[in-house]
Amino acid sequence: MVAVQGICYTAGVELMLNADVVIASEDTVFGQLEVLRGIMPFGGATVRFVQAAGWQKAMPYLLTGKTFDTQKANELNLVSEVVEKGKQLERAIEVAKEICIAAPLAVQALLASATDGVTLGHTVAFDKMDNYLKPLFESEDAQEGVRAMLERRLPQFQGK
């Protein structure tokens, strides 16, 4: 979870691209300026920026160091949500709390499976999915989730 505001250049963008959820203030300015310094992004932007935005959308910014605003970052799929200036941290905490309501084992498995899809390809990710599902279905949290649904109450997950 990341909340960004103000100027988010180079390493800031690289850190942001490593996050699962990015909440951006409407006034943020982004840029991968490395090519203007004689180097290239080395924290993953050459992969993650392209992966999020697509080759044709990412390259003009990576190859030139041109900066862009929050609206463009949203269009490029680099941020999850844009909020009013000054509300980014509050909103990030709200989203984090929403995630914390979910079963921790399920969240961990979901992130691992999604990462498999991105890093190993969808075929391998589908093949590995049972490795995540079997322990989940056998977990106390899965039993609690079903009970809570039948009893029409919020589940109380324990990460077991």
Regions found by a protein language model. Name each.
Residues 10, 43, 67, 86, ...:
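Glycine-rich phosphate-binding loop at the start of an alpha helix
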Residues 23-28, 70, 79-127, 134-140, ...:
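C-terminal long alpha-helix characteristic of the crotonase
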Residues 3, 9-63, 76, 91-95:
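CoA-thioester-processing core
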Residues 145-160:
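Short, basic/aromatic-enriched C-terminal tail that caps enzymatic domains
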Residues 45-48, 57, 69, 106-109, ...:
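Hydrophobic alpha-helical segments typical of transmembrane helices
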